[in-house]
């Protein structure tokens, strides 16, 4: 791609089709020293990967609301202990010349661990620990994986009305 050939994209062009979080994830998928070949297929793959992480965190958030408030079981503690190994892989990848592609694979390991080892029967402490482990590593990479609740237009209008009447 080159500007003189006219076969390039600006961030503004890409943002019309994709969320900028997807672009960030796409760029993190490759080593910073290597050139990145842009294609819509690769952007779709990045979108799917990011959606997979967001879905895992969203599912854990829903489980967290209905989880029981008791102490972690021994099996749950073993799973949480295994996250420390994944943290080590993440840290090693980042120490290896900022290898974000390998760091992302560590995040996907956590997602796989969370998806296969979480259910409505787990404790709140356990579900929260799994969720926080994914969110923490994603946050280090600059990825926002917790979905913000959007306010509806009527809610916004009601809040504005409250502010106007209290002033």
Tell me what each language-model feature is.
Residues 2, 6-167:
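Structural preference for alpha-helix termini/caps and helix-kink/transition segments
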């Amino acid at each position: 791609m080159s500007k003189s050939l006219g076969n390039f994209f600006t961030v503004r062009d890409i943002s019309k089709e994709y969320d900028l979080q997807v672009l960030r994830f796409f760029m993190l998928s490759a080593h910073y020293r290597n050139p990145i070949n842009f294609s819509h297929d690769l952007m779709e793959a990045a979108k799917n990967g990011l959606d997979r992480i967001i879905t895992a965190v969203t599912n854990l958030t829903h489980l967290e609301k209905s989880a029981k408030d008791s102490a972690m079981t021994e099996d749950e503690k073993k799973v949480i202990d295994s996250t420390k190994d994944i943290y080590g892989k993440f840290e090693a990848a980042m120490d290896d010349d900022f290898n974000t592609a390998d760091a992302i694979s560590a995040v996907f390991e956590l997602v796989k661990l969370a998806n296969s080892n979480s259910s409505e029967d787990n404790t709140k402490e356990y579900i929260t620990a799994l969720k926080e482990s994914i969110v923490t590593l994603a946050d280090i990479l600059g990825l926002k994986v917790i979905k913000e609740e959007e306010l509806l237009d009527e809610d916004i209008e009601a809040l504005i009305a409250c502010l106007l009447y209290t002033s």
